[in-house]
From Swiss-Prot:
CDD domains: DAGK_IM
Binding site for a divalent metal cation: E42, E90
Task of the protein: Catalyzes the ATP-dependent phosphorylation of sn-l,2-diacylglycerol (DAG) to phosphatidic acid. Involved in the recycling of diacylglycerol produced as a by-product during membrane-derived oligosaccharide (MDO) biosynthesis.
Listed name of the protein: Diacylglycerol kinase
Catalytic site: E83 (proton acceptor)
GO cellular component, one term: plasma membrane
Biological processes per GO annotation: phosphatidic acid biosynthetic process
Membrane topology listed for this record: Multi-pass membrane protein
Gene Ontology MF term list: ATP binding; ATP-dependent diacylglycerol kinase activity; metal ion binding
Gene this chain is encoded by: dgkA
EC number from the UniProt entry: 2.7.1.107
Keyword match Hydrolase: no
Length: 137
């Protein structure tokens, strides 16, 4: 069995046959749920989740349009994805390079910057909808 047809899960000692068809779909969904559970363990993600809930409450108060809710949800999903990638980068760097290195620091800083960009985008958009579209109208 070649390397591209194997998947390793925690606790397994050898290669496992890759699932195909509908089993692959369920396996992929299981891995995604595992990633979501892992992401909930990150304090930064929990803070972002609270901020999203606050934005949704503010959108309700100002009477945001359906499009504005959809745009905010898309921005939040992007932020979740970037937070997941950033967490993966941090875990890989910590595993591969437990000592402090410039390359590891750069990788972590770049992942963090990507998250910051989306946090700012989410905040600016939410503020625009609430302040300019909501209270100014």
């Amino acid at each position: 069995m070649d390397a591209k047809n194997t998947t390793h899960r925690i606790g397994q000692t050898g290669p496992v046959e890759k699932q195909t068809g509908i089993r692959h779909l369920f396996a992929a969904a299981s891995y995604s749920l595992g990633g979501a559970k892992r992401l909930i363990g990150e304090a930064a993600f929990r803070h972002e989740l609270i901020a999203f809930a606050a934005a949704m409450i503010a959108f309700i108060i100002v009477g945001a349009t359906f499009f504005q809710y959809v745009a905010m949800a898309i921005l939040f999903l992007l932020m979740m994805a970037f937070e997941a990638i950033n967490t993966a980068i941090e875990e890989i760097v910590d595993r591969v390079s437990p000592e402090i290195s410039e390359m590891g620091k750069n990788a972590k800083d770049l992942g963090s910057f990507a998250c910051l960009c989306l946090i700012v985008a989410n905040g600016v958009y939410a503020a625009y909808v609430v302040i300019f579209d909501g209270f100014m109208n």
